[in-house]
Amino acid sequence: MPPVDPHSYTDGDHPVTAKAALAFYLDFAASTIHASALLTLSAPHSGDLLLDTRALAVHSASTASGPPSPIPFSLADAADPVLGSALTLTLPPDTTSFLLTFSTSPSASALQWLSPPQTASSLPFVFSQCQSIHARSVFPCHDTPAARITFDLLLNVPTQLSAVAAARHVSRRDPLPSDHRGACDDALWCAPGRIVEEFQMEQSVPPYLFAFAAGGIGFRDLGPRTRVYAEGGDKVLDEAAREFAGVEEMVKVGESLFGPYEWERFDLLVLPPSFPYGGMENPRMVFLTPTVIKGDAAGAQVVAHELAHSWTGNLITNKTNEDFWLNEGFTTYAERRIVEVVQGEERAALNMGIGWRGLNRMMERFKDNMEYTKLKPKMAGIDPDDVYSEVPYEKGFQFLWRIERQIGRPAFDEFLKNYISTFKFKSIDTETFLEFLKTNVPGIENQIDLQLWIEGTGIPPDAMEPESAIYKKICSLAAEFKSGKLPSEDEVADWSGQEWELYLENLPTDVEASQVTALDERYKLSESCDYEVKVAFLQLAIPTGCRCYFNEVEKCLKQVGRMKYLRPLYSSLARCSGEEKMLAHRIFSEAHEFYHPIARSVAESILSKHG
């Protein structure tokens, strides 16, 4: 039984799911989905078949062709803390499809259910976040990026709500008894006050890109194939529409660089502030944190990254999470190429500078376990969420930039387009990429130590710090801070959030409380509306013992659930002793129900690690 993926029960000798037809009844009162899944395999199969599940109650399994007959199944009693529970089906000879009925748990790791008081619309809300290995908590599946699926989805929701999904919207209509295939009884499915939203995803995607949301959602059109959705009414929608007004132009830039956009639409959903990521690249419907709406179009930076995934990550996908750099390193490179065209070379270089500082910071984070500074780490038994970091993004970017510098941009552009067209709608591993690289760039292995880049720990000696006038100027100003010199108002007059972020990232960590407060008194960084700036400043302030910022830290941790902010703030508090550590535990005890389950688990692990 060869494993396909260290994070899945999928058996490499067996066919995998090729299509899923899903019917979901969203029970907001119980924070539960009552569901059915008609799964079609990539080839006929007989005997045992393993699927991934986590905290699912599986009610029945039956054949889907001819008169239905029960299929024997068993669910492992003891759930693995990382993998969940294997669902074993004993299929009749030459089975190609079968039907499962099941229910999710209120604690499903992919789902967050928000009650009306927790939303801006005063209506209930639910959204999914399946990356890295959480689709198995929504429906039984081969939850590995090696197994790409198409899917149909029916979402049965209260009529006052709207639903969206990372798929083509087919219709909004009355429920029909024939819809649900046993997900629940007819009376519940067709009850008054319910509506069905129907979706189809015809291009194959890995299960982690399955996504939906339902709530008081409205929208604004941005262009012929772009639209922004949001919960929170006209004010939020208008702000989002202004922030992302240039998205259609960005799509065109992406096509000019990387080839045709294969997903038809590029829509955006601004989620409630508990969303645990900056953005999630779900095809056709990118999920975004509201913290990217800054009022200065800077949020387009996050959108550029998620757009770039349309080619690198969604079209070509890492085969396992050990190959995650293939998704994120390529996408970080592609994002910066888009930014370079749309916002200029200086802005792209600034982006690279922030990334360079982030990569160096990860070396410190993983100094006691350098395995996770490799581009291809060994991750058996490790939850990907626990070691999520900037390494695959920034070291992956550095590797690709190193190749570009070696062969020249025109040749690298040709290589990149060839790579995308060759492997689109496929999942590949690092070894496949390296073979493709060596075949298409003969002799590259003699010019770059490929093994050192992929298997080596730390930052390779031929990685390069970015060069630009603004980057050097900001680093120089940061170096002067130690001696007590603050940047003048003229020097920062044109700074956006990114400039401040880079400045704060480059400040020495062993600073005095008086220096921190002096900086804040002049520039009010602790009150910034840009969370990148605010959190970077608070992270600097916490170790100095500046208790005057405890209120701002608490507000951040209670108002926003993005892990990019939770990790450094909880870590900074928990690494201290006394009052700071107590504050971290108190805030978490009061705020944990606000967090998405993924973020909650990460915060718990930080507090547990530091006692």
From Swiss-Prot:
Hydrolase in keyword set: yes
Compartments where found: Cytoplasm
Record's keyword terms, sorted: Cytoplasm, Hydrolase, Leukotriene biosynthesis, Metal-binding, Metalloprotease, Protease, Zinc
GO biological process: leukotriene biosynthetic process; proteolysis
Binding site for Zn(2+): 305, 309, 328
Transmembrane domains' residue ranges: none
Bound cofactor: record note: Binds 1 zinc ion per subunit.
Cross-referenced InterPro entries: Aminopeptidase_N-like_N, Aminopeptidase_N-like_N_sf, ARM-type_fold, LTA4H_cat, M1_LTA-4_hydro/amino_C_sf, M1_LTA4H, Peptidase_M1, Peptidase_M1_C
The keyword Ligase is annotated on this UniProt entry: no
Binding site for substrate: 129-131, 278-282, 562-564
Cofactor annotation: Zn(2+)
Domain of life: Eukaryota
EC number: 3.4.11.-, 3.3.2.10
Entry-linked CDD domains: M1_LTA4H
Enzyme superclass (EC): hydrolase
Reactions mediated catalytically: an epoxide + H2O = an ethanediol
SUPFAM superfamilies referenced in this protein's UniProt entry, alphabetically: ARM repeat, Leukotriene A4 hydrolase N-terminal domain, Metalloproteases ('zincins'), catalytic domain
UniProt GO MF annotations: epoxide hydrolase activity; metallopeptidase activity; zinc ion binding
Catalytic-site annotation from UniProt: 306, 393
GO CC, alphabetical: cytosol
Family: Belongs to the peptidase M1 family.
Function: Aminopeptidase that preferentially cleaves di- and tripeptides. Also has low epoxide hydrolase activity (in vitro). Can hydrolyze the epoxide leukotriene LTA(4) but it forms preferentially 5,6-dihydroxy-7,9,11,14-eicosatetraenoic acid rather than the cytokine leukotriene B(4) as the product compared to the homologous mammalian enzyme (in vitro).
Name the UniProt record assigns to this protein: Leucine aminopeptidase
UniProt source species: Oryza sativa subsp. japonica
Taxonomic placement: Eukaryota, Viridiplantae, Streptophyta, Embryophyta, Tracheophyta
